């Protein structure tokens, strides 16, 4: 697994409400997480965004998992990008091309799974780990392209500060400030995590034609021009609206921790089929046939990761 290193961390200030001239957007929906409890791979599982085909394009799935033993052994992917963020603990990642790495709390990894991706995600040293993973659609023209990985260490995130707010921009841009360069991926997104003291606020300026999700890890906030309340494990979704710069206002009711995702819709039909995200059910079935025929490559002979491939 290749790891990209980025330039020295930048320190800057978020725009205050008086500095920003962008139009503030209102939240479209607030969605409660669905608690699934224990699953075959996870000791505790929450669907922040259950697998949808296009409602929040380009975001297809957002899921939180906690595990300390099995985790997600060798499994395939095709036609999808993933952004995995480590909430707590350490996550071990391997792929069948020989890549290996360990992500710690606050680290992230971006993967584009084109024609063939075969990997596993495990609790490092069998100690508890909690992750949040987003699935992001790929355009049809890129679903059979090459597979790539980029590690995004917390230490390399762009640090953005203002009174009562500490944010880390992992990828994308906010108010002219940039995170890691992931321009090699086909559907660039912006992703940041932020800690807010009670009564603190900030504005996230983004193009109006992007979908935005504000997920509350802890505490309670108000978001958008209508000051919509969002509590722990709730997510406020903002529809794509128009071209031009807009602002997503986040105000902390209590001390709060939030994760913010934004991306431009792909605008193509898509079908989720187990670990595959193609444009038709037939293409998903073909991917599974190719995986079973061994076309994704051999599964390494590693006693800790040789369980049957797991479908998320």
Where are these regions (language model features)?
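Jelly-roll (double-stranded beta-helix
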Residues: 1-312
